[in-house]
C-alpha cells in the first residue's frame, strides 16, 4: 500500500443518458455473447489506433544511442539510473501496446532495452512483432528492480555508493500494531497449538514471528471454506484442533457464503470473527457492521450474531 502526490486535471462533467432497454447488449447468454464478441474485437482494434497517438505513450529523446521501453515504476527507476544517457518510450497503455510506435522508436537505436519487473509482457510483444530488444537475458524475472541494477545492466557501470553505518540496521519485519486486539487472540491460538486457517487482513501477520499461529492464507473468505474442506477430508479428530479466523469486513465481503456451506453440508467447524469494527488493513473505511456508510452517514448496522443465527448457526 502506498500514497503519492498526483496532479489533477480539469473535471469533466458527464451528463446522464436516457436509459434504454437493450438485452442483446447486456444479457450475456451464449447467443448474445457470440455477437458481442465481434464488438469486443472491434473495440480492441480501435484502442490499438488510440494507443499509437495517446500522450500516455510518449517518447523522450536525449540524443542517445540507447533506447529504453518501460512503464510504471520500472520507467521511474530507469530515469533515475540512466538520466539523459538513454532515450525513452514511456508506456502508459500496456494493452493494447502501440506496435507502430514501438517499431518506429526501436529503429533509431543501436540497443533497445525493455525494462519491466516480473513476466516479460512488453518484451514478448516486441519480439512477436519483429522488434529486437534486450530484456530478461540481462534482467531477472524475480523480485523488484532498483536503479543500481538497471544502471549495471544497461551501462555496465556501478551506481555510486552511499555512506553506510558500520553496524547493520536491525531487522524489523511487519508485526501487528501495539495495542491491537488480534495479538491476544493469536497468542491464545498459538498456546493451544491449534491448526489455524487464516484470511486476508492485518491478522495475516499472525503467521509471522513471534505469534506464528496461522497455517494457511489463500484468499478472501477461504479461511472458512478451506477449513470446511479440511474437516470433511481429515475427520472429526482433526477438526477438534482446527479453527478459522476472519475479520469482520472480510467476513462481510466473502465469508458468509463459506459459513452457509458449513451449515448446508452439516459441518461442525469453529469460526472466529475478529470484529474490530473497521477495515483495518486497506484504508480504515467503514463496512456493513459499523453502522456508517463510506460517506460517514449513519445507516443500519449489520449484527454479526443475528446474521450468523439467521443462516442456521446455533452456537
Give the ranges of each region predicted by the language model:
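Short gly/pro/ser/thr-enriched loop/turn and capping motifs at secondary-structure boundaries
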Residues: 95-96, 120-122, 139-143, 203-205, ...
Amino acid at each position: 500500500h502506498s500514497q503519492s502526490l498526483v496532479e489533477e486535471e480539469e473535471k469533466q462533467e458527464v451528463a446522464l443518458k436516457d436509459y434504454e432497454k437493450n438485452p442483446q447488449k447486456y444479457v450475456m447468454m451464449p447467443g448474445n455473447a457470440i455477437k458481442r464478441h465481434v464488438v469486443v474485437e472491434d473495440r480492441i482494434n480501435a484502442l490499438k489506433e488510440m494507443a499509437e497517438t495517446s500522450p500516455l505513450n510518449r517518447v523522450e529523446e536525449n540524443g542517445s544511442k540507447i533506447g529504453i521501453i518501460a512503464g510504471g515504476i520500472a520507467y521511474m527507476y530507469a530515469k533515475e539510473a540512466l538520466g539523459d544517457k538513454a532515450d525513452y518510450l514511456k508506456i502508459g497503455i500496456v494493452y493494447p501496446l502501440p506496435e507502430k510506435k514501438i517499431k518506429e522508436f526501436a529503429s533509431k537505436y543501436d540497443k533497445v532495452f525493455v525494462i519491466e519487473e516480473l513476466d516479460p509482457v512488453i518484451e514478448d510483444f516486441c519480439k512477436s512483432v519483429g522488434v529486437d530488444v534486450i530484456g530478461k537475458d540481462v534482467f531477472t524475472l524475480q523480485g523488484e528492480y532498483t536503479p543500481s541494477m538497471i544502471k549495471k545492466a544497461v551501462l555496465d557501470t556501478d551506481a555510486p555508493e552511499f555512506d553506510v553505518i558500520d553496524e547493520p540496521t536491525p531487522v524489523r519485519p511487519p508485526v501487528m500494531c501495539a495495542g491491537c486486539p488480534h495479538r491476544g487472540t493469536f497468542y491464545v491460538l498459538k498456546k493451544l497449538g491449534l491448526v489455524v486457517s487464516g484470511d486476508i487482513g492485518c491478522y495475516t501477520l499472525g503467521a509471522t514471528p513471534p505469534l506464528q499461529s496461522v497455517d494457511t492464507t489463500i484468499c478472501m473468505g477461504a479461511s472458512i471454506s478451506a477449513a470446511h474442506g479440511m474437516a470433511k477430508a481429515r475427520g472429526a479428530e482433526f477438526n477438534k484442533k482446527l479453527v478459522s479466523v476472519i475479520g469482520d469486513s472480510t467476513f462481510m465481503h466473502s465469508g458468509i457464503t463459506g459459513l452457509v456451506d458449513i451449515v448446508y453440508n452439516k459441518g461442525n467447524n469453529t469460526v472466529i470473527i475478529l470484529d474490530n469494527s473497521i477495515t483495518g488493513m486497506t484504508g480504515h473505511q467503514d463496512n456493513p457492521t459499523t453502522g456508517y456508510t463510506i460517506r460517514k452517514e449513519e445507516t443500519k448496522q449489520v449484527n454479526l450474531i443475528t446474521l450468523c443465527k439467521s443462516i442456521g448457526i446455533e452456537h
